[in-house]
Amino acid sequence: MAGAAGPGSGPGAAGGDGDDSLYPIAVLIDELRNEDVQLRLNSIKKLSTIALALGVERTRTELLPFLTDTIYDEDEVLLALAEQLGNFTGLVGGPDFAHCLLPPLESLATVEETVVRDKAVESLRQISQEHTPVALEAHFVPLVKRLASGDWFTSRTSACGLFSVCYPRASNAVKAEIRQHFRSLCSDDTPMVRRAAASKLGEFAKVLELDSVKTEIVPLFTNLASDEQDSVRLLAVEACVSIAQLLSQEDLEALVMPTLRQAAEDKSWRVRYMVADKFSELQKAVGPKIALSDLIPAFQSLLRDCEAEVRAAAAHKVRELCENLPAEGRETVIMNQILPYIKELVSDTNQHVKSALASVIMGLSTVLGKENTIEHLLPLFLAQLKDECPEVRLNIISNLDCVNEVIGIRQLSQSLLPAIVELAEDAKWRVRLAIIEYMPLLAGQLGVEFFDEKLNSLCMAWLVDHVYAIREAATNNLMKLVQKFGTEWAQNTIVPKVLVMANDPNYLHRMTTLFCINALSEACGKEITTKQMLPIVLKMAGDQVANVRFNVAKSLQKIGPILDTNALQGEVKPVLQKLGQDEDMDVKYFAQEAISVLALA
C-alpha cells in the first residue's frame, strides 16, 4: 500500500509529510502487521477508523487488497476482520461498490476455523442485500459458484449458507444453476458438506418456487433423511418443518410423511430425539388432520422410546402437543391416546424423564378441565410430589398455580397439601430441607390467608428442628416470606412467635431466636427492630450459656446499622461493654468486634 499511511510505512512517514491527522492512522496500519496478536486485533477492531481516514477510494484500492493478501493470521484476528467487513459497505462508497468487499470475505469463508467461516458467511449474507440484481449476478453469484465447487470442503460448506440470499433476485437461467449447485452439495462425498446443505435445506426451500420444492427439494430431503450419517439425517428432520409448511395436505401425505414416519423410528436415537424435540413445530406445520393420523402414533412410540433422552424430549412436548390439538375431540384424543403413556412416564426409571414430564404435566389441567384433572391428573401429581427426585417435586410445586386456577384452592388443599405436609415432616432431613426451599414459592402461589391457616405452623416448627441445617434454612425462609407478605404481616404473625422462643429452656432454640432476628431485621425495618426485637436481644445478654451471649454480640453487630444513634449509644453500647468484660473469651472477642464495627468505642 503506497502513500504516507501505507502499511509498510512507519508512523514517522505521515508526520514527515506534515500531516499530523494521519499519524494515529499510520500507527493503526503498522499495527496490522505487528507481531503482537493483541495489537493486530485492536487494529482490526478499529478498521472502520482507518477506512474513514483513508477515504473510500484508497480503502477500495489499497486497504482491501492488503487485507485480502494478508489473510494468514490467528483465528481471533480473522474473526474480528470477518465481522468488521460485514458493516463496511458505506466505507467503500456505498452499494455500487459493495462487490469490493467480496474478495477478502471469500478468502475468510474458506479458512479452517468454523467460527471464522460462519462469521464470513454472515457478513456475505448481509452484503448480498446491498447488491443490485445486476451486481448480484455479476459478482456475488460467481463467488457462490466458486465456493460451491471449491477443492476444500471448507469452501463448499460456506457456499451452503449463501444460496438462499442470492436465489430470489437471480434470473431464471441463473436460478437453475444455483439449484444445480445446491443439489450436488446435498450429495457431496464429505459428510460435513452434506450436513451444511441439510442445515440450509429448509431455508432454501422457502425461497424456491412451489414446483421446484416438489420436484427438487423433496427428493433431496428424502435422500438426506436416509443418509448414512445420523448427523445429516437429524438435520433433515429440522428442514422438514419448513418444507411441510409449503406443501398442500395431499402432497404432504404422499411426499413427506413416509420419510418423517421413518425418521421417528430411525435406528439412531439422535434422529428420534430431533423428531421429539421439533414435535410441536412439526405438528403445526403438517396441520391437524395429518397430525392426528400420523404424528400421534409416532409421538406414542417416542414416549415409550428405549432411550431416556428421547423419552424426556417427548415428555417436554406433551403440554404443547395437547394444546395444539383441534378443540373438537381434543379431550377424547388426550384421554385415550396420550394419558395412558403419561401414566407410565410418572414412574419412569430415569429421573430426567420424570422431571421433564413434571415440568409440563400441570399445564394439562387447563386443557382437560376440572373433572378430568381431579379424577385423572391429581393422582399423578400426588405420585410426583412424593418422588424421590427433588427436581420432580420442585417442578410440581412450581406449577401449582396452573392447577389452582382450574380446580380451586380448596380442592388443592384437600388433595396435594397433605402430601406437602407429609414431606415437610419427613424422617429424612434432606427431604424436609427441600420442602423448606420451596415454601416461599408455594406461599406466593397460595396467598397469605391460606398460608397462615395451613402452613405457618410448619414454618415455625422447622425453627426448632433437631438438625441445624433445617433451623438455618427455616430462618432464611422466614426472611423470604416477609419480603413476599410485607412487614405488617411479619409484625402480627411471625415476630411474636419468634420472640417467644427467647424463653425456651433449650439454648439451641434461644439461639434460633437470635438467628431469626438477624434475618428478619432488614426485611422488617427500623421501627419493628427497635421496638420489638432489640429489647429481647438485650435481655438475652444475661443468658447463662456463653454460646447464646456471644451470639447476642453478633446479633447486635448485625442489627446495629438499622438502629438510630440514641438506641445504639443508650442501649446497645452499655450491653456490649459489659459483654466485652465477660469471663468467656469468645463472648469477649465478639463483643469487642461489634464495638469496633459499630464505632462505639
UniProtKB/Swiss-Prot annotation:
Positions carrying N-acetylalanine: 2
HEAT repeat residues: 20-58, 59-96, 97-135, 136-173, 174-212, 213-251, 252-290, 291-333, 334-372, 373-411, 412-450, 451-489, 490-528, 529-567, 568-601
Disulphides: none
Superkingdom of the organism of origin: Eukaryota
Subunit structure: PP2A consists of a common heterodimeric core enzyme, composed of a 36 kDa catalytic subunit (subunit C) and a 65 kDa constant regulatory subunit (PR65 or subunit A), that associates with a variety of regulatory subunits. Proteins that associate with the core dimer include three families of regulatory subunits B (the R2/B/PR55/B55, R3/B''/PR72/PR130/PR59 and R5/B'/B56 families), the 48 kDa variable regulatory subunit, viral proteins, and cell signaling molecules. Interacts with IPO9. Interacts with SGO1. Interacts with RAF1.
UniProt similarity note: Belongs to the phosphatase 2A regulatory subunit A family.
Protein's name according to its UniProt entry: Serine/threonine-protein phosphatase 2A 65 kDa regulatory subunit A beta isoform
Gene transcribed to yield this protein: Ppp2r1b
